């Protein structure tokens, strides 16, 4: 068994950063569904802006809002306005074809790569 990329949201923009929240990344529910993420799932977040990487967990954001909010300590590492990739992984014994979600500058789903 190996950890393989299952899906990612590619080049999303962080719309908010809230250091006072208890932790996590808030993601628009539409993007959560299209990526196949589960609320509470561990994800890897990479900043294309700074190169920072961190692991956190997904929480539900308002559908069609475009919300991508870094919460808690993660908001010190990845800030509002940064371009990020959010990746989910799966433990599997055979190759899988990952879903790569494309979004526009308002984090609206535009298609799969």
Could you tell me what each predicted segment is?
Residues 2-4, 14-94, 105-106:
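Compact, glycine-rich, soluble single-domain proteins
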Residues 8-10:
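Short structural boundary motif marking the start of a folded domain
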Residues 93-94, 99-113:
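Helix-rich terminal scaffold detector
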């Amino acid at each position: 068994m190996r950890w393989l990329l299952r899906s990612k949201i590619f080049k999303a923009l962080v719309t908010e950063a809230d250091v006072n929240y208890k932790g996590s990344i808030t993601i628009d529910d539409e993007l959560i569904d299209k990526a196949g993420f589960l609320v509470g799932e561990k994800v890897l977040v990479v900043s294309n802006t700074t190169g920072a990487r961190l692991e956190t967990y997904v929480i539900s954001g308002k559908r069609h809002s475009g919300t991508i909010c870094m919460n808690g300590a993660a908001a010190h590492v990845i800030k509002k306005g940064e371009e990020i990739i959010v990746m989910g992984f799966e433990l599997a014994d055979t190759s899988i074809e990952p879903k790569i979600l494309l979004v526009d500058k308002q984090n609206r789903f535009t298609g799969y790569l």
